Amino acid sequence: MLPAVVAGELLMKILVLADVESKYLWDYFEKEKLEGIDLILSAGDLKPQYLSFLASFSKVPVLYVHGNHDDCYDIQPPDGCIDIENKIYVYKGVRIMGLGGSIRYKKGKNQYTQKEMNHRINKMWLSIKKNRGFDILLTHSPAAGIGDGPDEPHKGFEGFNYLLEKYKPKYFIHGHIHRSYQIKFKQEYEYNENTKIINGYERYIFEYPDV
């Protein structure tokens, strides 16, 4: 299949996944459903077998960050997939920065205080500088006060607000907030003139201007 062209620009079609394994893709899988997909991004809390399954049937990279329920990744990481935690992965010129995990609300892995997440962000400084910023921020949790929840486990990270304001990525992609948690649930919306936000709950496809 030829890549899509809009107004003279090549577009990269990206499949985003998070939180719930899609029956459409897993239980009722047909290889044709992945046709035209150029990249797969997982925002966390998905079974490793699910990601491995999709990786085995697609010929594109499957990038992922950890959700707060992904402790099993330490023992059984998704086969054929690429962990981009605390990294910037460049694919076809698109710079994708990964920071998984949720706010700390109990004992366990992949949970962080605001201070701990800020420390992780600070450690990314050299990589951000080397890559001259990033185009997509891929996380599990949302930013503070932007599509997050009122309860402690679903609060967003303040450090993500800083990243959006300072580096102005084209897309901020997260999970963690399920469709049932919000009356006015939106999967894609504009944060400002620079950045669109996508909640990748279950599955979502968007097109990124290819460079």
Give residue spans per PLM region:
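N-terminal active-site segment of His-dependent metallophosphoesterases
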Residues: 2-57, 127-133
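Active-site neighborhood of phospho(di)ester-bond hydrolases with catalytic His/Asp-centered motifs
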Residues: 16-18, 39-45, 63-68, 84, ...
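Conserved catalytic scaffold of divalent metal-dependent phosphoesterases
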Residues: 16-24, 66-155
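Binuclear metal-dependent phosphoesterase catalytic core
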Residues: 17, 26, 88-92, 163-167, ...
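Active-site environment of divalent metal-dependent phosphoester hydrolases
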Residues: 21-25, 46-52, 68-74, 104-108, ...
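A short, gly/pro- and small-residue-rich
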Residues: 58-68, 157-160
